Amino acid sequence: VFEIKKGIVKRECELANGYQVVEVEYEDKDVFLAINFLDINKKVVIGQEVLVNITARKLKLGTGGYDYILPTDSFCNLSKGHIMKLRYTPLQFSVLTEEEKNPELFNRVPSFDDLIIVVCELHSMLLPICLYLKEFYRNMKITAIINDWGMLNAKLSNNLRFLKENHFVDYIITCQEAFNGDFECINEINSLIFSQSLDTQVAIISPLPGIVGTGTKFGFSAYKAVNVIEDISRFGGKVVFPVRVSKSENRERHKFISHHSLTILSYVNSSVEIPIFEFEDKLFFTRVFRVLNNYRAKHNLIHIDEIDDNIIVKTMGRGFEEDKEYFLQLFATAEYILRKLQRR
């Protein structure tokens, strides 16, 4: 399915760093919000006719209810780089990567044994982990490495903007097909190499919102974490892996422990560190522990019995109290990272 409609811009709702949100009225008088990327298009004005991609909304996919405006006029956004994003599509454009700026940095074989590396399967994991870390270690340097398992434009993430503006994240690197970080790298390994040059202490690899899931065993985009974890291990790194737990999730395949987490743990050939919070709900804890204990021969399970859970955040539309276990598990992951740093 690919559906384009003409419409008229009726109102500007938001002008953020790198994009514009407007209200568009279509030929059938439907009115919806649309996003205009200012990297690839001029700012649109009230009364202007625009071409809009409405495919995701028509399919009722998780795009936040937005349509996307296509470029409609001559436009040039100069870049010194030669590495293409959205390759071989009508919207391909170039970026300047760190590999182009300083190739010598990336020609050595890396060692990641001095870097704490977290691999997240969901974008909503990034915010609580970073908030907790910076709450108790404000001078820590955190780099968020954003890949292409979800949406691609980092500037669209409200969580990332909040983290950067409030200094809960120091640097943002986008890699693979993702773009609009503070820095651009080709892949996760080179992103980690570059993050070391920034004196990063904790590197958190995460997708943006909008990961793909099909309900099948391997049909989810975060399965790529298997390859990323194995590559990190190949170069001496040890990954901290925050397991996705939930007591509030209605979908059986994600209840208690998400099948995404379990599939990654089952098929990755490298060992990861899995912090487990000892939940007050002993029945829930026992069920989570029994499942994860099956992976003890391969992975390192760490009990975290005490955290400071006064940091309240939201995830995927559910408040802290509505999906408390999800956050407590992420806070426990951050608590484990703090303890690792204290031992160094």
Question: Which residue stretches match the model-derived regions?
Answer:
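Extended, charged alpha/beta regions that create polyanion-binding interfaces
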Residues: F2-D114, P128, Y137-M140
